[in-house]
Amino acid sequence: MTIIVTGAAGFIGANIVKGLNERGETDIIAVDNLTRADKFKNIVDCQISDYLDKTDFVERFARGEFGKVRAIFHEGACSDTMETDGRYMMDNNYRYSLAVMRACLDQGVQFLYASSAATYGASETFREEPEFERPLNVYGYSKLLFDQVVRRVMLTALSQIVGFRYFNVYGPREQHKGRMASVAFHNFNQFRSEGTVKLFGEYNGYPQGGQMRDFVSVEDVVKVNLFFFDNPDKSGIFNLGTGRAQPFNDIATTVMNTLRGAEGKPALSTEELAQEGLIEYVKFPDALRGKYQCFTQADQSRLRAAGYTAPFLTVQEGVERYCQWLLKQPV
């Protein structure tokens, strides 16, 4: 039975396609926009049955042109939190998602989609409840508005609808994202090219490099998606993070020590790296003041209650694995 992945050449979408392949699934229709042609590299080692441009997909799916479809993993979106074109953001993230969901409901197709922890914005509590949702940018609002519609639709839906509020995801196949790629990716490239890593200095009560995020490996993101794919009776909106906030210092230290280890050099503590000038703390940029999440940490209660019991990788585990993968890629 056919599976459809939108955003299939993007970061999370490509990893989901690869994860499905590893389970023997190859009847996969990949949907994306390859205006950025280099994104093809994300799925060059994947097996798919067809590729469609996103502009052609929704109407054809709504007409039932693809026969019996089991599920759609809807990962396609504009994920640039600095995007200021609100009309583009709402059309791409909200209107398009509505059309995909409605077609799924009409045909009884499982609908698993990407929401975001950006829906919480300035909140200090990260639980899937309306009182904690205060997005700081139009990206977060576009995701929240769709979540709000989903909450109403789920009351009467006869097929699965699952939204995943992704926290700070890192891992393979994100190189096309540019400035929106993970901190781990940028730290890796900066240390290799410059021999140092730059982190934000003190801001909003947090020490240098001490701003904390829930960094989650894309390996775990794929596992959670596939868990719900295997359990079509479970619907809801779920946080997808480790439940453990870690400072940016941990990312930088893990990246640098992995690269040092590859050169036969000993591991150093964060303090030692800073003392040797290998970590450089820079003034927090004025452009981000008031628009920046200094702390995120997923409340996993709802995810665990749904039956997902597997442990999540720590930054030290996941980032080291990611760096080892990056080291094997062609320069």
Curated annotation (Swiss-Prot):
Pathway membership: Nucleotide-sugar biosynthesis; ADP-L-glycero-beta-D-manno-heptose biosynthesis; ADP-L-glycero-beta-D-manno-heptose from D-glycero-beta-D-manno-heptose 7-phosphate: step 4/4
Sites where the protein binds NADP(+): 11-12, 32-33, 39, 54, 75-79, 92, 143, 169, 177
Cofactor binding note from Swiss-Prot or TrEMBL: Binds 1 NADP(+) per subunit.
Pfam families: Epimerase
Active site residues per record: Y139 (proton acceptor), K177 (proton acceptor)
Record key words, sorted: Carbohydrate metabolism, Isomerase, NADP
Binding site for substrate: N168, R179, H186, F200, G201, E202, Y203, R213, Y292
Enzyme class: isomerase
Gene3D superfamilies: NAD(P)-binding Rossmann-like Domain, UDP-galactose 4-epimerase, domain 1
Keyword Cell inner membrane: no
EC number assigned by the record: 5.1.3.20
Domain of life: Bacteria
Molecular functions (GO terms): ADP-glyceromanno-heptose 6-epimerase activity; NADP binding
Keyword Amino-acid biosynthesis tagged: no
Cofactor(s) needed by this chain: NADP(+)
Residue ranges crossing the lipid bilayer per the database entry: none
Catalytic activity: ADP-D-glycero-beta-D-manno-heptose = ADP-L-glycero-beta-D-manno-heptose
Gene Ontology process terms (BP): ADP-L-glycero-beta-D-manno-heptose biosynthetic process; carbohydrate metabolic process
Biological role: Catalyzes the interconversion between ADP-D-glycero-beta-D-manno-heptose and ADP-L-glycero-beta-D-manno-heptose via an epimerization at carbon 6 of the heptose.
Record NCBIfam families: heptose_epim (TIGR02197)
Free-text comment on this protein's domains from its UniProt entry: Contains a large N-terminal NADP-binding domain, and a smaller C-terminal substrate-binding domain.
UniProt-listed PANTHER family: ADP-L-GLYCERO-D-MANNO-HEPTOSE-6-EPIMERASE, NUCLEOSIDE-DIPHOSPHATE-SUGAR EPIMERASE
Quaternary structure, from the entry: Homopentamer.
Family from the record: Belongs to the NAD(P)-dependent epimerase/dehydratase family. HldD subfamily.
Protein name: ADP-L-glycero-D-manno-heptose-6-epimerase
Gene: hldD
